[in-house]
A protein has these predicted regions:
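A short, basic/flexible loop-to-alpha-helix module at the beginning of a structural domain
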Residues: 1-11
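N-terminal Rossmann-like FAD-binding beta1-loop-alpha1 element of flavoenzymes
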Residues: 14-39
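Conserved redox-cofactor binding core of oxidoreductases
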Residues: 63-89, 95-105, 110, 120-125, ...
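Glycine-rich loop(s) and the adjacent beta-strand/alpha-helix scaffold that form part
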Residues: 32, 36-61, 249-253, 261-332, ...
Length: 543
């Protein structure tokens, strides 16, 4: 896609920082509106075979990543063990810090396409209940937008991406413009019937992407920007890609409320270059975008609220494996964003002594290994994962503490921990999961009692994913907040159209702009916000 020898210094109509789910869409939206766009990514532009690799070579790379310390934190996530570790950032080359007693597991994808290449592909809308906010340490923290503001963008994205799902009629999980849902497995249908009839809890088809079909989709999955928005953006002829360049900061005119471009650091040699543009769109992922803004403050960026970097959130989560009687022989369809199920509890929770809501995502009969590796070959294996809303708190924040990378770029210091509210939510999740498993005739068990794992069992000792406790912040890869949108400049960092209050020609459209976390998987809403903000910027440009 890229030709680094071409002139890129500008001036451009727009610079888009990051090429993942939001960055690819921002580039496409702006280019289709007539803007000349430079798309900058910190990582390389990989070919499909380089990105996905194959087994057993990927396994050897995982073991090397663990033993060398390059993937010490990211290897805690189960997704690491089914992907090419090349899609996970080298933690030695790209460090960050956190307090010793408050770990933060930050998963990064430093390549063109970003984390969209490892995204699970679940697409859920937020509701007005979510946008209305949640009770926090600062009172009720709400969004300055509602579902009506994003309706057209949600619908356009769902149609473009071709996601699956039912129309379930839930006020707290609005229906979308989806294709037919993917079918439950026989065990999932049995589970859903039991939970709905005996506990009164609704079990719905998950909403999202089906399995990647190379014959239909091409080499890249449609859930990735490489398989959807990026090739469309490049086909306009108005987008140029600058790979292997990490954006260090905004260029800010002294005493001005305008950014004139960005400073980008060549990852091959550390050389810095100034790239000029009328508009800058930050889509680098939540913490990367916050780090860019924090470094820009040192260059003169004004931020009137004093809230930049504060109120970082991730979804709090916990998981449970189980087995249940096999209701019949059959093939095992793959686990995907749409090939799975949800218990969309939201805030409708009996006996809850905490604020916020959660959902339970699960699958049964989609990932069993061969029978000789199963301790209970007559059963089918399932899992439930709870992910819940987190209360925004000023003490959970991203700052700069003087640590730098190999090229002297200041790296983020992440200080984030769960409060008693999140811990109470996790306890409720675990009770709810065990109730559901029991009424469905299943048995909740640790993974080691379900499978023989002779080669990898030593690696699983102490694994976060197998713990009954709340996983550390960052584990769920749904980090949001730190540059919240607000109705006025004293309560947030960006306005309702994602413009920095201190520099209105800079848009922050990724998860950093979220005032609250809600409980739903965030990517679809991030993309809807991106499309809305970029379309608004095009209207201002035309005027």
């Amino acid at each position: 896609m890229s030709n680094p020898s071409e002139q890129v210094d500008g001036p451009w109509d727009a610079i888009v920082v990051g090429s993942g789910a939001c960055g690819g869409l921002a580039a496409l939206t702006l280019a289709e509106g007539g803007a000349r766009v430079l798309l900058i990514d910190a990582g390389p532009d990989l070919k499909p075979q380089q990105a996905f690799g194959s087994e057993p070579a990927n396994l050897l790379r995982r073991l090397a990543g663990l033993s060398s310390g390059r993937h010490r934190r990211q290897a805690q996530h189960p997704g690491y063990w089914k992907a090419n570790p090349r899609l996970y950032a080298d933690e030695l080359l790209h460090p960050y810090t956190h307090p010793t007693d408050r770990p933060f597991l930050w998963t990064r994808g430093l390549q063109v396409g970003g984390r969209s290449l490892t995204w699970g592909g679940i697409t859920l809308r937020l509701s007005d209940e979510d946008f209305s906010g949640v009770e926090g340490g600062d009172g009720v923290i709400a969004w300055p937008i509602r579902t009506a503001d994003l309706e057209a963008d949600y619908a356009a994205l769902e149609r473009m991406l071709g996601v699956h799902g039912n129309r379930d009629g839930l006020a707290h999980l609005p229906d979308g413009e989806t294709c037919d849902p993917l079918p439950f497995t026989a065990a999932e249908r049995s589970f859903a019937d039991a939970v709905q009839s005996q506990l009164g809890l609704q079990v719905i088809h998950s909403r999202g992407f089906g399995p990647h079909q190379p014959q239909r989709d091409g080499a890249w999955p449609r859930s990735s920007s490489c398989g959807s928005t990026l090739p469309q953006a490049m086909a306009t002829g108005r987008v140029k890609l600058l790979a292997n360049h990490l954006v260090e900061s905004l260029l800010v005119e002294h005493g001005s409320a305008t950014a004139t471009g960005v400073v980008a650091v060549d990852q091959a040699n550390g050389n810095r270059r100034s790239v000029m543009a009328d508009l800058v769109v930050l889509c680098a992922s939540t913490i990367q975008s916050l780090a860019i803004l924090l470094r820009s403050q040192e260059q003169g960026l004004k931020e009137p609220s004093g809230r930049l970097g504060s109120r970082l959130m991730d979804h709090v989560s916990t998981s449970q494996f189980f087995c249940m009687p096999q209701p019949g022989a059959g093939s095992q369809p793959p686990l995907t964003g749409a090939g799975s199920f949800f218990l969309p509890c939201g805030r409708r929770l009996d006996g809850a002594d905490f604020s916020g809501g959660y959902g339970l995502w699960g699958g049964i009969g989609r990932f069993d290994p061969p029978s000789w590796l199963r301790r209970r070959p007559q059963s089918v294996t399932g899992f439930l994962i709870g992910h819940g809303e987190v209360i925004p708190q000023a003490c959970n924040r991203v700052t700069l503490n003087g640590a730098v990378d190999r090229w002297g770029v200041a790296v983020p210091h992440i200080d984030c921990q769960w409060s008693s509210n999140e811990l109470a939510m996790v306890a409720h999740m675990r009770q709810q999961m065990k109730r559901c498993i029991k009424v469905a005739g299943g048995e909740a068990l640790p993974l080691k009692e379900l499978f023989h794992l002779p080669l990898v069992e030593p690696l699983l000792q102490g694994a976060v994913a197998l713990s009954d406790a709340a996983s550390p912040p960052g584990y769920y890869i749904h980090e949001v907040g730190g540059a919240a949108m607000s109705a006025d400049p004293s309560h947030g960092v960006v306005d309702p159209y994602n413009r920095l209050w201190g520099a209105p020609n800079v848009l922050v459209v990724d998860g950093a702009c979220w005032p609250t976390s809600a409980w739903q998987s965030p990517t679809l809403t991030m993309m809807a916000i991106t499309r809305r903000a970029c379309r608004r910027a095009l209207k201002r440009r035309a005027a």
